Amino acid sequence: SLGLDPKVHIVDGNKNDNFWMMGDTGPCGPCSEIHVDLTPEGDTRGTLVNKGSAECIEIWNLVFIQFNANPDGTFSALPAKHVDTGMGFERVTSIIQGTKNFTRFAEATISNYETDIFRPIFDEIEILSGKKYGGTLPASSELAMLDAQQATDVAFRVIADHIRTLSFAIADGI
């Protein structure tokens, strides 16, 4: 049957998976994450959640800020509690565009950068650099392990991220 079965699709977690802290001290609390299973079958029953798989992507999280983590490792209740929620706009866009509006999962290439958000930036970088963006996604983050195209693609993504960051900063008057 189609749809959400809470017994199957809601995955229990522990403090490592379901408790958010910004650092050793400060506001914190339990959290929930919403993931999308991008496997061809479309349902791995939560086995890929928080395993670093490109086929199971977190698109949304909710943090129920209700504690303060103290330097001695204890937690104090906060006088005011709130929910901090965040959705990955680029992640949602990449899933929608990469799966042809959730219709084709088998041949999907899901990357925040394989969207119409980044293509105009990559086009301009190609013109200015004389290099082509290949869309490779290296298995390793070790720069020494990358081939020439992977290194070029990483550089394109870094430049594009910096351009977007600067655009937002300029728009905010910074």
Question: What kind of region is each of these model predictions?
Answer:
Residues 1-174:
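Structured aminoacyl-transfer and RNA-binding surfaces used for tRNA recognition/handling
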